[in-house]
Amino acid sequence: MDRAPQRQHQASRELLAAKKTHTSQIEVIPCKICGDKSSGIHYGVITCEGCKGFFRRSQRCNAAYSCTRQQNCPIDRTSRNRCQHCRLQKCLALGMSRDAVKFGRMSKKQRDSLHAEVQKQLQQRQQQQQEPVVKTPPAGAQGADTLTYTLGLPDGQLPLGSSPDLPEASACPPGLLKASGSGPSYSNNLAKAGLNGASCHLEYSPERGKAEGRESFYSTGSQLTPDRCGLRFEEHRHPGLGELGQGPDSYGSPSFRSTPEAPYASLTEIEHLVQSVCKSYRETCQLRLEDLLRQRSNIFSREEVTGYQRKSMWEMWERCAHHLTEAIQYVVEFAKRLSGFMELCQNDQIVLLKAGAVEVVLVRMCRAYNADNRTVFFEGKYGGMELFRALGCSELISSIFDFSHSLSALHFSEDEIALYTALVLINAYRPGLQEKRKVEQLQYNLELAFHHHLCKTHRQSILAKLPPKGKLRSLCSQHVERLQIFQHLHPIVVQATFPPLYKELFSTETESPVGLSK
């Protein structure tokens, strides 16, 4: 009996297994461009999915980016989207090319070098795992009351850059990682973006808070009150406010009242909360305001606009899907740095992000909008609504531009956007919350902080001009409706090219658990 076909089949299986092993080993090396978790060799260089997609798009449209500084911008997980020119130059300098060799065609010298780097990374991880870990549980925490928070990616690495003085956002040493405990298990891509995976203990305690320069009012168990803040919302209320804040659709006076069991906070503590939210916002801004203002004179030419209009519908949808997904990842990082957010149960973290992340992106968009000529910053320059004609959803684009125009008329400061977007995200009226009271407490604290800041800066009048929450929900619904139409026309494009996080948040097509847990 001829066993040649059997041997050939066995060899093929072994080759496939070897390739999978090589890929998994390569992924221990961080992205050479930005330092994020890599996903393999792309265009000749070990990169993450984000840098792979960025390079692919830049080559597809022969993009000509420009740098507003000295063409030496640092490129890391936090700043990689701030300067496309320097990011592309780093890609090219490190050898990314459409003509780059495949992994299987590497020379022996290249393979040996790669193997040595893999071994180095594995040794570093092994050393970290062997380091002793001292963990102090919170006072009074017992058994199931001890909360653990899962941060999502292998070895606790987050998708975006971390600041060393923000423990909740820092990468967890492997020694802190252990299997998830009790509670719901999430395997979706939103969790992968920073809320699930190997769990990292981030229990809060008063002692830990003091050591980190924070006070106990950061927890959801502590409430700020108008009396302790020296605020009287009845006195400061704008004449046109009426009963704003008493329902789920406005941002007037605080929506919830303090509870007897919740400790009060002082004016100093409210000031600290304002500063904490604003700091978290500054560290997770996709683009710096000064850069956006400097670029306002850099407008797409008529020829460039025509080029965008001639693109296929699916290509423009893919581009916008990737840009929106990147913006959402920054919102995820912002949420994790918000005081009290990581103390919510995991289900409620997911619910708030799935419902509010795009709403936060829409509010942040007003920073990139120029009301003088009704243009928005997109892929390095400013352009009007006509730039997005190929999407085939002019009504949605017009609604988004109108919303940005209305917000820009309020002349928000960066701190006001920080506090406003925190309230957009932390909304106790979202359906599906399991511990609604905790979210109410956190929302109440943030509302007091927002009102305190507006009173301090004599800007209370903007409360009457803020768009109702229903407006943001309407824009998000329009987006989902247009996506459903596009998905019906181009299902393969959505399945094959759209980011997993985008598909999970918006697509109506349910993916298999296997696909979600990759």
Curated annotation (Swiss-Prot):
- Region Modulating, as annotated, extends over 1-30
List localization entries: Nucleus
Listed GO MF terms: DNA-binding transcription factor activity; nuclear receptor activity; oxysterol binding; RNA polymerase II cis-regulatory region sequence-specific DNA binding; zinc ion binding
Basic and acidic residues: which segments have biased composition? 109-118
Top-level taxonomic group: Eukaryota
Q: Does the keyword Transcription apply?
A: yes
Report NR C4-type zinc finger ranges: 31-51, 67-91
Motif AF-2: residue span?
Answer: 501-506
Name the DNA-binding stretches: 31-96
Enumerate the SMART domains for this protein.
HOLI, ZnF_C4
Note one Pfam family from the annotation. Hormone_recep
Q: What is its main location?
A: nucleus
Instruction: Tell me the segments the record calls region Disordered.
Output: 105-183, 238-258
InterPro entries cross-referenced by the UniProt entry: NHR-like_dom_sf, NR_DBD_ROR, Nucl_hrmn_rcpt_lig-bd, Nuclear_hrmn_rcpt, ROR_rcpt, Znf_hrmn_rcpt, Znf_NHR/GATA
Specify the NR LBD domain's residue ranges: 269-508
Ranges of Low complexity composition bias in the record: 119-130
What domain comment accompanies this record?
The AF-2 (activation function-2) motif is required for recruiting coregulators containing LXXLL motifs such as NCOA1 and NCOA2.
What subunit structure does UniProt give? Interacts (via AF-2 motif) with the coactivators NCOA1, NCOA2 and PPARGC1A (via LXXLL motif). Interacts with the corepressor NCOR1. Interacts with CRY1. Interacts (via AF-2 motif) with PROX1. Interacts with FOXP3. Interacts with NR0B2.
Q: What does this protein do?
A: Nuclear receptor that binds DNA as a monomer to ROR response elements (RORE) containing a single core motif half-site 5'-AGGTCA-3' preceded by a short A-T-rich sequence. Key regulator of cellular differentiation, immunity, peripheral circadian rhythm as well as lipid, steroid, xenobiotics and glucose metabolism. Considered to have intrinsic transcriptional activity, have some natural ligands like oxysterols that act as agonists (25-hydroxycholesterol) or inverse agonists (7-oxygenated sterols), enhancing or repressing the transcriptional activity, respectively.
The UniProt similarity line reads: Belongs to the nuclear hormone receptor family. NR1 subfamily.
What name does this protein carry? Nuclear receptor ROR-gamma
Q: Which organism is it from?
A: Pongo abelii (Sumatran orangutan)
What phylogenetic lineage does the species belong to? Eukaryota, Metazoa, Chordata, Craniata, Vertebrata
